[in-house]
Amino acid sequence: MNKKLIFFTPLFVLLGVCILLIAGLNQDPKKIASALIDKPVPEFYQANLHEPSQIVSPKEFPKQPFLLNVWGSWCGYCKEEHPLLIEIAKTLPIVGVDYRDNRQNGIKMLKRMGNPFILTIDDSHGELGLKLGVDGAPETYLVDENGVIRYRHSGLLDKETWQTVFLPKIEALKNK
């Protein structure tokens, strides 16, 4: 009896761990909600990408709904979504966070592809990304006029997601 218990206990523990791992792998990271939903953007003081002597904080954010877009010049999906951000910026302010990037590379990318951002934060060391809970770029946050995060999208922002997810949420914010 004791030998069976000694043999089967680790087997059941291993089986339980395997089930938990498989369940975790089946989760879509884009659907994992941020712990910051309905909370203010975390406090930070970081350099402006284009003017490193200028320190940026949430006090500089627009006083209307806006997007907070985490990107990097090294990120293929960031480059892919960039033309859509240029279009969105015509109707909605976007604040950019150049995440874990070389400052000069970020500036070169914006010169080459266009700059959709009203403000670009240099997060070359990832401090703001850590506070936001960023798990990779790109990530796009919808922030309300009070600086409160209302939605987080992890991964490529495409036209369909913009139209079916973001636009209704923005309309709801404007109508409240």
From Swiss-Prot:
One of its GO terms (molecular function) is disulfide oxidoreductase activity. This is Probable thiol:disulfide interchange protein DsbE-2. PROSITE patterns: THIOREDOXIN_1, THIOREDOXIN_2. One of its GO terms (biological process) is cytochrome complex assembly. It comes from the Bacteria. The keyword Cytoplasm does not apply. The chain crosses the membrane at residues 5-25. The gene is nrfX. Residues 26-176 are periplasmic. Disulfide bonds join C75-C78. It is a single-pass membrane protein. Its main location: membrane. Residues 1-4 are cytoplasmic. It comes from Haemophilus influenzae (strain ATCC 51907 / DSM 11121 / KW20 / Rd).
